[in-house]
Structure formats: structure tokens, C-alpha cells
Amino acid sequence: MRNFPLRKRRSENNMSRTENVELTVLCLITDGDRMLLQNRIKNDWQGYTLPGGHVEPGESFVDAVIREMKEETGLDIMNPRLVGVKQFPIKDGRYVVLLFKAIEFSGTVISSDEGQMEWVESNRLSEINTVGDFKDLMRVINDPALTEFQYLVDGDTWTVSIK
């Protein structure tokens, strides 16, 4: 491992180009035509979505998604692949979600206090209640030509930008 000097932050008076960022991960785990989804029960974001969680300070993104999948699903995933980024503004910063895919795993599926885990056939997606941005999220994850899902905010209006 090679050490690099840390760049000094600009002072408040010197127009800092840094911002506070909250880092999280989501992972699409597939088994053939099935995907593992979490039916979230928390009031802030209900419906079926991908499992995930926060990146701990000093933790690599790959280590974070492996740890979160173990905690949220009970599965040990191998070789997760980074396939995109979702981001949106939050008070005093930005919320960044690194989007991963995994097809290699071992273990037995468990649920957590975040919600019930369930294998869902891809042809059943239209029959279940997914979180509001699930279709756009899946579009970015599954289309190799896309890498970014961003919410743009103008006053009270939130617009989705996909690139």
C-alpha cells in the first residue's frame, strides 16, 4: 500500500469545493430469473426495493456492500460489480448510493428489522408494490449504457435525470 499526502481543505473564505456526502450501497442479487428484494416496512420508504445500507468510515465500497448484504439478507456475496450511482441533495450535502450487482452468493436468506426478504421473479415486478423510483433504479442497474440516476431539485420540484 502506498501513502499519499492528504490535500488541505480550502478555508471557508476561500470558496471550498468540498461538500458533505453520505455514502450508501444497494445491491441487486440475482439467481437466474429471480431477484432478492426487501419489502421495507419503515414509514419513510415503504415497498419492495433492493437491500443496502451505509458505508462505514474508512470502509471500502466493496467491503461495505459485502457486509451490508450479510447483515440485511444473510447471504455472503462474492465479486459484487459496481454498475451505477444514484444521488440526491440532502440538507448540507449530498446522498450518494453506489449500485452493485451480484450473481455469486452462498448462505440462507434471512430478513431483518428493515423488512422481509423475498425472491421475486422478474416477470412479477408489475404485480408488487415497489418503492417510487424502483423502475428508474433498475433501468440504470440493468442498462450498460447508463451509469447515473440523479434527483435534481428546483424549489419543491424533484426531477429524475438518468444518464
Predicted features, each with a name:
Residues 1-14:
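N-terminal amphipathic/basic-hydrophobic helices that include classical n-h-c signal peptides
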Residues 34-70, 156-163:
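Conserved Nudix-box catalytic region and its N-terminal flanking loop in Nudix hydrolases
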Residues 12-35:
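Conserved N-terminal beta-strand and adjoining loop/helix that marks the start
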Residues 28, 37, 97-101, 119:
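Conserved hydrophobic/aromatic beta-strand scaffold that supports enzyme active sites
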Residues 110-142, 159-163:
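NUDIX/MutT-family hydrolases
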Residues 88-108, 137-140, 145:
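Active-site-adjacent beta-strand/loop module that shapes the phosphate/pyrophosphate-binding cleft
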Residues 14, 83-89:
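Short, solvent-exposed loop/turn elements at beta->coil junctions and helix N-caps
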Residues 76-84:
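A short coil-to-beta-strand element that immediately follows conserved catalytic motifs
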